[in-house]
Amino acid sequence: MASTSTAGDRIKKFLGIPADERLNDTACYVDGSFVESEPTTQDFLNEIRPTVQGTLNYLRELFPFVNWIFHYNLTWLLGDFIAGVTVGFVVVPQGMAYAKLANLAPEYGLYTSFVGFVLYWAFATSKDITIGAVAVMSTIVGNIIANVQKDHPDFDAGDIARTLAFISGAMLLFLGLIRFGFIVEFIPIVAISAFMTGSAISIAAGQVSTLMGIPNINSREETYKVIINTLKGLPNTHLDAAMGLTALFGLYFIRWFCTQMGKRYPRQQRAWFFVSTLRMVFIIILYILVSWLVNRHVKDPKKAHFKILGHVPSGFQHKGAPRLDNEILSAISGDIPTTILVLLIEHIAISKSFGRVNNYIINPSQELVAIGFTNLLGPFLGGYPATGSFSRTAIKAKAGVRTPLAGIFTAVLVLLALYALTSVFFYIPNSALAAMIIHAVGDLITPPREVYKFWLTSPLEVVIFFAGVFVSIFTSIENGIYVTVAASGAVLLWRIAKSPGKFLGQTEIYTAPRELVRGSKDSGLTQSLLQKSEHHTAFLSLDRDDLSNPELQISTPWPGIFVYRFGEGLNYVNSAKHLDNLTIHVFKHTRRTELNKFEKLGDRPWNDPGPRRGQAFLTDELVSRPTLRAIILDFSAVNCIDVTAAQALQDLRNQFDRYAHPDKVEWHFAGVSNRWTKRALVASGFGVDSLRTAKVQRENHKGGVQEVDQGPLVAIGPSVSASDIEAVPVGTSGSGSTDEKRPEGEGGATNGGMEKGSANGEDISTVPTATSADACALARDAGGKRLVPVFGINRPFFHIDVATALKSAVRNTGVVAAE
């Protein structure tokens, strides 16, 4: 470190940067003392430098299955088999239905689902999630294909979908590998709910025409136009409506019936759950049978009595490398952000939700690796963009899945369908598939009770919710995504910029016995109970806007001392607002130290012109105000500050020093937990004593003025035994000499005092450090534990909490309360 420091000093000297004495702690070094060292660039590089163990952990995280695969057992196997087969029965008809939403042949849905189930288990951090074709993503892909083919009619729909999946997968895989999974935290629940609700309404509205057999309805238009055109086309309803409406009714009836039977017969609840889960399979088999009876002599699907699925090729007929030429890449480039955003929203939201329900934590970065890898390799077998499915994940979780390996059993079932059941799929009615889609997306609509909960929690976000839904309905799903995410980001910035700070007052809080809480009318009993109860000083808002009891007595901390708590960080966005509020409040409740500073009216600044002509300047109210002595900033909600905020604090300090001249305003900081924040404050001149001697005038408790030398801070370190403690010089506090007697109970944490805690981290106290005898007495507490400083003695104006900071500020002002 010495060479690094020397090199840094040489660079500073070469560039003409003066040495900052505030960062020079040599005057504070005493053997046995705890002195804080400033974090350096080398420290930062050491923190982010990869280590051997870190690299091994990273590789282990890439393949999380190694943590559980060697513990696999028959019980897990049975649970995975049941869940995997159950999901397999659902995913086969769903996959083909969703492929139709994507403007693709039905087999593409099976390809996509197969790849997701085969690959996901090796990279999964969620046992419940299922990756495959989903309704919302399929609709987005269908819209993209339709838009691209308008300008490039020669492009094959399958090529567009596969290329889109490959590029999106590569980007997601990259984000996952560099561990950028935290970006999903920028998308709030309200934005996700609005997106899912708007998408579900759009998808359901687009499927009504297929359900009813209404021809010539463009389901790719804006949702409101689709609804209007569908209503206009009701007179043109065909026989498909009989198949579709009865299928939709059957799906809802079976679910309702199984739910009721599960409630009536709790012991058979699991059996009724499996019956409900397989309702899609029952409906598809039933309507395949009906369709075969009606159309068994039909060879051309166009000649069927109602629209049917038609030929589904067996096996993987669209395998091969995706198309990656410049022409197709430029055509889909504008739609890649939307695709990535939808993949992220659906997958991470679903996996987090089920992780909380089933008591495990997912790794968002690893989930990005999983869906990225799936979408990167899926196109080689004919897959299009795949992500997590809410309905299938819910089924899988309720079916008793034990590990992610259940996806293998689902993949086997999909593979069996691809090679053995494609001839049966010929007779599936399109209206029955539409009924399945409507039934599936209906669960994605946010219920009114949830919207009402949003309203109770944050009314502004309800506006964002409805804005996203309406934009999705009246424009497109893609625009709905952008609006909700952008609006949520704007609200976040607005809340940071307008985060309210609070001026704090103090009150005594008692741990009250039950008799006192119930309200005893006996004052003697009340006093007796209060004396027995524990109490401490708490700091609450002076504005009383925190819903505290209006009868609670909250007093100002001390005349001329102000405690300010930041509400939500301190940065370039909100620093001006916070410090303006601080300035206005201080000027309103204090006076200048020199009342007659301006001898003539013309000497006064324009923004402080004083009273009108003929009115007295020194009013009784003004004279009675205290002078500004200290500012205490509660940094418990501040993690880091930037250059703008630091400069604003420096400017405010200079302004207050001019206001309090010839006194100097002390700045105390409580709850600073980030060492880089402390470094920034120290570099700005806060938190440390001046290393040069300064003349400071203070009012003593008798009303006189006392001029004292404020010397450099000297460390005091209590030793383990009394024999090890030697007398050392103590810096004055600016309110008297070192041997001045302090009033009891006003232990300071700066120049004349130190914050100390027990070596085992249990007890914390504020103690004066005046003489070696005092240090000898304070080396151990009543329990015999060795006392050590909480923070470095070279940073005396940083305190562990507001109460300690206030004690220090009161002590250093030299003001003694009247007995």
Curated annotation (Swiss-Prot):
Residues 746-755 have a biased composition (Gly residues). InterPro entries: S04_transporter_CS (IPR018045), SLC26A/SulP_dom (IPR011547), SLC26A/SulP_fam (IPR001902), STAS_dom (IPR002645), STAS_dom_sf (IPR036513). One of its GO terms (cellular component) is plasma membrane. Induction: Highly expressed, but only in cells subject to sulfur limitation, and it is turned on by the positive-acting 'Cys-3' sulfur regulatory protein. It is found in: Membrane. Residues 551-708 form the STAS domain. Residues 726-766 are annotated as: Disordered. It is a multi-pass membrane protein. Glycans are attached at residues 24, 581. Keywords: Glycoprotein, Membrane, Transmembrane, Transmembrane helix, Transport. GO terms for molecular function: secondary active sulfate transmembrane transporter activity; sulfate transmembrane transporter activity. Belongs to the SLC26A/SulP transporter (TC 2.A.53) family. This is Sulfate permease 2. The gene is cys-14.
